[in-house]
Curated annotation (Swiss-Prot):
It comes from Pepper mottle virus (PeMV). Belongs to the potyviridae genome polyprotein family. It holds the Pfam family Poty_coat. The keyword Transferase applies. This is Genome polyprotein. It comes from the Viruses. GO terms for molecular function: RNA-directed RNA polymerase activity.
Length: 381
């Protein structure tokens, strides 16, 4: 005697669609095949439904990849009756699978889809259930509630509130809100991607290509040059007033590169271009400190005494929300000290303007200077 469930309950297992993945749906139908053993017609109906289901998407793609599970009748017999499969059965089974066409034909079985009748799901239960459906209902997590734990008491649920609701005051134009809250709830861009302290990606691409063309080097050689430029900028800064050449070491040999293409093509500024190297520069300083004490020149000039803050001691470091408070304070203090004595003048001396006055002053050798006369030894100031 093999204990069996009611046929109606097994049908529910095969038609239930609460799986997050399509593979889980197929596994549930195979479980229904196992439970239906002993009901020959029900097993056949489930197999027919499974065959039809594998022709639909996304299950057809899973079957083509060989990931669709299946339970053979010989496996069920081994499971329930512990009867091994002999060689003759395997031979007949193999020949049948070779001879079968894609269309599987049955003698007298019929499959009923889209039925309108309701059936009793249990012997003593009077609850009605939905009939077996031939169409596949798309699985979605939206709108579904969590299963109720039968071991708990009460039916109270904890309400969830939204961080942004439609009841708050919002900017409006002609009586309509100008914001889309659904998009705003999901819109969380990276700070560095929208920060105006670094150049945009298109500006960086333009600068990179312009420098490569100016240096007349290939795509494969350019990353090596960028390595040297980043290390040089860590030591010497990214001031717009730098000129001349920058140096990269090739072993013990110094290789010079002109700074003009680097500075002239940097838009908006060289510091905003080099901000793209901030994370790599920080990791580079940390790597150097693992081998030997290393403090960038930016920190040495500011007399930074804490070696643990060396990774923040370069002027194109990008301060983010993840920057520690102590490191942020040290970086801002170093920046303030560097800018304290700096003076920026909008206009310099205009060399295109000449004087229109005629100088009638006459001086002799006794005069102290071209702009100062003497009178009997008395100097007129």
């Amino acid at each position: 005697y093999v204990p069996k469930l009611e046929e109606e309950r097994i049908v529910i297992y095969s038609t239930m669609d609460r799986a997050d993945l399509a593979e889980h749906r197929l596994e549930a139908i195979c479980a229904a095949m196992i439970e239906s053993w002993g009901y020959s017609e029900l097993t056949h109906q489930i197999r027919r439904f499974y065959s039809w289901l594998l022709q639909q998407q996304p299950f057809a793609s899973i079957a083509q990849e060989g990931k669709a599970p299946y339970i053979a009748s010989m496996a069920l017999r081994k499971l329930y009756m512990d009867r091994a499969v002999d060689e003759e059965e395997l031979r007949v089974f193999t020949e049948m699978m070779v001879a079968l066409d894609d269309e599987f034909e049955c003698d007298s079985y019929e499959v009923h889809h889209q039925a309108n009748d309701t059936i009793d799901t249990g012997g003593n239960s009077k609850k009605d259930v939905k009939p077996e459906q031939g169409s596949i209902q798309p699985s979605s997590n939206k709108g579904k509630e969590k299963d109720v734990n039968a071991g708990t008491s009460g039916t109270h649920t904890v309400p969830r509130i939204k961080a942004i609701t439609a009841k708050m005051r919002m900017p409006k134009s002609k009586g309509a809100a100008v914001l889309k809250l659904d998009h705003l709830l999901e819109y969380a861009p990276q700070q560095i991607d929208i920060s105006n302290t670094r150049a945009t990606q298109s500006q960086f691409d333009t600068w990179y290509e312009a420098v490569r063309v100016a240096y007349d080097i290939g795509e494969t050689e350019m990353p090596t040059v960028m390595n040297g430029l980043m290390v040089w900028c860590i030591e010497n800064g990214t001031s717009p007033n730098i000129n001349g050449v920058w140096v990269m070491m090739d072993g013990s040999e110094q290789v010079e590169y002109p700074l003009k293409p680097i500075v002239e093509n940097a838009k908006p500024t060289l510091r905003q271009i080099m901000a793209h190297f901030s994370d790599v520069a920080e990791a580079y300083i940390e790597m150097r400190n693992k081998k030997e004490p290393y403090m960038p020149r930016y920190g040495l000039v500011r007399n930074l005494r804490d070696a643990s803050l060396a990774r923040y001691a370069f002027d194109f470091y990008e301060v983010t929300s993840r920057t520690p408070v102590r490191a942020r304070e040290a970086h801002i203090q170093m920046k303030a000290a560097a800018l304290k004595s700096a003076q920026s003048r909008l206009f310099g001396l205009d060399g295109g303007v000449s004087t229109q006055e005629e100088n009638t002053e006459r001086h002799t050798t006794e005069d102290v200077s071209p702009s100062m006369h003497t009178l009997l030894g008395v100097k007129n100031m």
